[in-house]
Amino acid sequence: MEQYHGTTIVSVRRGNQVALGGDGQVTLGNIVMKGTARKVRRIYNGKVLVGFAGSTADAFSLLDRFEAKLEKYQGNLTRAAVDLAKDWRSDRALRRLEAMLITADRETTLVITGNGDVLDPEGGIAAIGSGGAYAQSAAKALVENTELAPRDVVEKALTIAGELCIYTNTNFVIETLE
């Protein structure tokens, strides 16, 4: 059976603001199954943003576990992410999950990979998914050459990714924290 795949998630941090956005397309093989999926959410009483790419069921499983880790560590994003990554690497069932997460709170942005890596992106920009490289490139250019707010950078970066990546559409969900 073919896997559901394809999306673009991008995060931009500038000053005291962070924005995280994603498109809404879910693809099975060469068929668009849904165009309005919500892959970016607020969790932990609205204090943490999370976006996911990869297999939808796998991403929801990881999201549930990540929320539990945030509760365990009282909202400490880094400790929750590292503990989730440890579990991901050591648990046989979790190792088979095919998803990635970008998480952000007021101070920190982290990418959690399927290999169990926790990465703090350089320059305040992170992107994952099939259109991630397009979105990251666009966001980097916009951050370096404009004074746009993070939300505007995310929207423009997703628009560019949506124009270039066949697995990304232009139905965006964008969340911000200040």
From Swiss-Prot:
Allosterically activated by HslU binding. It holds the Pfam family Proteasome. It comes from the Bacteria. InterPro entries: ATP-dep_Prtase_HsIV_su (IPR022281), Ntn_hydrolases_N (IPR029055), Proteasome_sua/b (IPR001353), Proteasome_suB-type (IPR023333). It catalyses: ATP-dependent cleavage of peptide bonds with broad specificity. The keyword Transmembrane helix does not apply. Its main location: cytoplasm. GO terms for biological process: proteolysis involved in protein catabolic process. Belongs to the peptidase T1B family. HslV subfamily. This is ATP-dependent protease subunit HslV.
